[in-house]
């Protein structure tokens, strides 16, 4: 199901790709495609999500290994939402929705179904679904800062992609940090009593508190379209507030930068030479010297003086 974990790096993650500003995002070479849609009233997001069984054509070796492994992305890992109800409506193929251990197969003929807050669930593409499975996902708007919304999905799918393809697995702390910021909590094992309680506080303590102290943050500029919203979310959390930089809001537009750059160049006295292109400056002086030399040569001929111009522009005069 793609939930391959590795030993935590104990250092902040740096994205490998940029996907901010895209209404449609594609991950894992098109194995997963998400199209963000306008959410209906009372819902925090809506998107059309498509999973494929495989990818055709020549593909990089790291993606090939992932597709052939048990960790091929075919749906999110088992999770629950503390505050939100999630909705599913299949458009194409067969989607399996598992809620509290009970699986239901959904097709385009089925009506939208819901999974209430607190239920442990997952969904994935059925093996018998032809080429792909497409489902419309949405969730209730709980009004809290950290919930399922576009900011969360852009960052989770961006990190999921980069971690599995380029880092060999998910950093446990980073994963819990992002999940906590999206009301997306990983339950404890099925045999564990109070698995939902433990799963929730594990995300909060490890992902939010310890992760925040170590410099982990849930959102990244490279993945996030509405960065102002993401910054507001992180500034509201005391554990991530210090990790947020907001000077970007005062960045000048390109036209403003051009206007500021049109001012006269400052002079630097004896430091000026090393802030110029010495090669080009030397060539310019040579060219000017040669031009001046030719002019004087013409003048010398007219006055009966033969003029020889050296390469450096200096003159030797001889009486004719």
Curated annotation (Swiss-Prot):
Q: Does the keyword Metal-binding apply?
A: no
InterPro entries tied to this protein? RmlC-like_jellyroll, RmlC_Cupin_sf
Residue pairs linked by disulfide bridges in the UniProt entry: none
Would you tell me the Gene Ontology cellular component terms? membrane
Describe the practical uses of this protein: Terreic acid is a metabolite with antibiotic properties. Terreic acid also acts as a selective inhibitor of human Bruton's tyrosine kinase in mast cells and other immune cells.
Which keywords does the record carry?
A: Glycoprotein
Reported function: Epoxidase; part of the gene cluster that mediates the biosynthesis of terreic acid, a quinone epoxide inhibitor of Bruton's tyrosine kinase. The first step of the pathway is the synthesis of 6-methylsalicylic acid (6-MSA) by the 6-methylsalicylic acid synthase atX. In the biosynthesis of 6-MSA, atX utilizes one acetyl-CoA and three malonyl-CoAs as its substrates and catalyzes a series of programmed reactions including Claisen condensation, reduction, aldol cyclization, and the hydrolytic cleavage that yields 6-MSA.
Protein name according to UniProt: Epoxidase atD
Q: Which organism is it from?
A: Aspergillus terreus (strain NIH 2624 / FGSC A1156)
């Amino acid at each position: 199901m793609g939930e391959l974990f590795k030993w935590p790096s104990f250092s902040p993650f740096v994205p490998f790709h940029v996907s901010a500003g895209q209404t449609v995002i594609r991950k894992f070479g098109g194995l997963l495609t998400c199209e963000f849609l306008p959410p209906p009233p009372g819902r925090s997001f809506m998107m059309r999500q498509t999973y494929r069984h495989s990818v055709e054509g020549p593909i990089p070796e790291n993606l090939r290994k992932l597709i052939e492994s048990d960790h091929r992305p075919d749906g999110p890992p088992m999770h629950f939402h503390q505050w939100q109800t999630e909705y599913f409506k299949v458009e194409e193929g067969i989607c399996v929705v598992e809620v509290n251990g009970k699986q239901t197969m959904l097709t385009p003929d089925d009506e939208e179904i819901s999974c209430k807050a607190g239920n442990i669930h997952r969904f994935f593409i059925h093996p018998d679904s032809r080429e792909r499975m497409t489902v419309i996902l949405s969730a209730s708007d709980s009004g809290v800062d950290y919930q399922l919304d576009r900011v969360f999905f852009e960052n989770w799918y961006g990190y999921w992609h980069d971690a599995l393809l380029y880092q060999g697995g998910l950093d446990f702390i980073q994963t819990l940090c992002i999940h906590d910021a999206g009301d997306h909590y990983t339950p404890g094992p099925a045999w564990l009593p109070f698995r939902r309680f433990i799963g929730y506080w594990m995300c909060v303590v490890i992902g939010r508190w310890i992760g925040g102290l170590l410099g982990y943050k849930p959102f990244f500029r490279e993945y996030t379209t509405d960065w102002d919203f993401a910054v507001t979310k992180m500034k509201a959390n005391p554990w991530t507030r210090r990790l947020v930089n907001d000077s970007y809001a005062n960045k000048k537009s390109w036209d403003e930068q051009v206007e500021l750059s049109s001012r006269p160049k400052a002079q630097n006295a004896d430091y000026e030479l090393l802030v110029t292109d010495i090669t080009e400056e030397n060539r310019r002086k040579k060219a000017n010297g040669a031009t001046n030399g030719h002019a004087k040569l013409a003048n010398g001929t007219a006055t009966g003086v033969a003029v020889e111009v050296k390469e450096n522009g200096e003159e030797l005069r001889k009486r004719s």
